[in-house]
């Protein structure tokens, strides 16, 4: 079993994503992510600027951000975003303890500003997801730039 497979299911379980949902999205994610790239965060999310666009699934690894969309009526999957983290700019996130949510925003290489809202249910999980995002986007980038 490769690194991605070993880390994807525990990350999805940690976020409370049902196995049926994970199974539907897994083939799309597998095509986008290298087998040696561990999953850091897997969660459902919505686009706050387009609330009727259906549900999204966000996968964050140490190298990529992949987002799939599932349509409301037919439950069809489509790849919404597949970006190398080095190609994202102006990445930010805003933890909201009052609503137990985290909003993530990033500008993709094509110049489009993407925003996703993760509802987490409990305030403790908000801080945990905040730490995961810090680890990937701040700590790892700092260590990579120091090594170069």
Tell me what each language-model feature is.
Residues 3, 7, 71-148:
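Acidic, Ser/Thr- and proline-rich intrinsically disordered linker/docking segments
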Residues 53-74:
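Short, compositionally biased strand/turn segments
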Residues 1-59:
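Anionic N-terminal interaction surfaces
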